[in-house]
Structure formats: C-alpha cells, structure tokens
C-alpha cells in the first residue's frame, strides 16, 4: 500500500484531478475535504501520511488549517497548493510548517514531484 494522502480543496474538479494523478502512481487517497475546517476534522480522523491543501477556501483557509493541524501534530506533513503564488503566501505557508508549495495551475508531474520529495 502506498502513502496515504488527504486532499483538501474547495474545488471538486481539482480534488478529482489530483486524486487521479496520485492513484496512477500507487499513492492512496484516503480522504477529501472541501474546506479547511473539514480538512482538520479529516486529518484527526484519518491520520494521513500527507495532506495536499489549497489556501483559499471557505470557513477556514488553508494556512489557518495548516496551523491547527501542526498544533495538534507537529510531525504532520503538508504541501500547500494555490493559485495565489505571491511570495508572502509561500513564506507564510513554509513558516507555518508546510513542506512545499505548488502554484496552480500545475501539471500532474509537479504534484507527483512534490509528493515524492516529501514522502517518497
């Protein structure tokens, strides 16, 4: 069984695209969430090896969700994905504990490269 991954993004098509790409390479997407609050809940429930998380989402944005997850589990592994590739967002994500940052729109290869680098 491959690494277990949680995808958190408010866009269903984005979750599906990422899931399809990861499944092809034997990664196991064990859950999805459509906002940061649900992402934190799913993280607690599923304890994935990796979280791929969007930044701009309703209820709780990705950076707030990242901070909550890291406060509960300092060893949590999170990669942020967002169309907002501004330097400040990248820096804030990394300072909050993200292992990598993927700028949308991205190719499947970029997601796979980041996942391999972070969890193998």
Annotate each predicted stretch with a short phrase.
Residues 35-38, 61-64:
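Acidic catalytic/metal-coordinating carboxylates
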Residues 57:
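Receiver (REC) domain active-site loop signature in two-component systems and cognate sites
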């Amino acid at each position: 069984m491959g690494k277990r991954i949680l995808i958190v993004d408010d866009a269903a098509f984005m979750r599906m695209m990422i899931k399809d790409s990861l499944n092809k390479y034997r990664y196991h997407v064990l859950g999805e969430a459509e906002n940061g609050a649900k992402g934190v809940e799913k993280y607690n429930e599923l304890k994935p090896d990796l979280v791929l998380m969007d930044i701009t989402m309703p209820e709780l944005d990705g950076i707030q969700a990242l901070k909550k997850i890291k406060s509960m589990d300092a060893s949590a592994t999170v990669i942020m994905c967002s169309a907002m590739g501004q330097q400040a967002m990248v820096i804030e994500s990394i300072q909050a504990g993200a292992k990598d940052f993927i700028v949308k729109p991205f190719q499947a290869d970029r997601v796979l490269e980041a996942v391999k680098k972070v969890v193998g």
